[in-house]
Amino acid sequence: MFRIRGQGPWEINLGCNFGCKHCYLGERPFSGLGWKDKVRLLDIMRAAGVLWLQITGGEPTMDPHFQGAYRYAWQAGMMLTISTNGSLLWRPDLLRLFRDCPPYRLVVSMYGASEESFDTLTQRRGAWKAFRRGMDAAREAGLPLRINVVVTEDNASEADEMAALADEWNVENHAYTNMTPTIYGGGEPLLAQSAAHLRQRKPFAGCNAGHTFFHADPHAKVSICKVGRDDQIDLMAEGIDGLTRLGTIADRLMLRTGGCEGCALSGTCRVCRPLAKHYQEARAPLHSYCQHGDKETAS
């Protein structure tokens, strides 16, 4: 039997109550598996050896089966991390769920330190108030929190304030500054970046995508990761045996092909091949992902 013995991020639903300008998902349809198929997917993940399950979205807590799926996975012995915008964490039913079945971590994205910047980036009036309400409730409940401080052009002037607010709450935080194209190769998220806050990536040193972890979308289409979604495996059709092809798919997708084939600088490339492909599809400036583009910025 195939056993991956690692992680299995799962997009339970792409639907979201925010409309963030920088979102890498692009289109966010509210759709996903029915309850029975969600249970079947979780059973397959457990049989495959998934120990750490990250449930994400969209906004995962909006899915009609989120609480049932979360509890089922928790009772199966998985360590659970939830990626959320925090806007619904005030709900009593969610607080009871996390009290009864403690998560390993709730990773909450912060999109500003003021109502104006937060609501502008999320393109939703009232988003800031919902975020603060959710965070106040989560902190009072003692939930294990981490904050991703998302820095964009809309909130760049508040980057230090966002980090300071997270520190004031005594919540571990990390600044996220470099956006990526959408999973469809759209360049819209790149337009939201704050040029002054972009960081130079370290050389890509390889990863175990498809070998020690995989990614499942809302319809149980499995890929090596959330970026490299080519050659997806339909777990509802193939079952656990379909996962045996993941390693071969991963090795093929990581090959330096297309415009990267034969590159003399591949040993110090800053992005993996699947991510480079998205940048190329988005017609992004070369310097945003490739060392060859450094000459453009230097001149």
Where are these regions (language model features)?
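Conserved C-terminal portion of the radical SAM core fold
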Residues: E11, A48-Q54, W74-S83, P102-M110, ...
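Conserved radical SAM core fold
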Residues: N17, P60-M62, G86-W90, Y104, ...
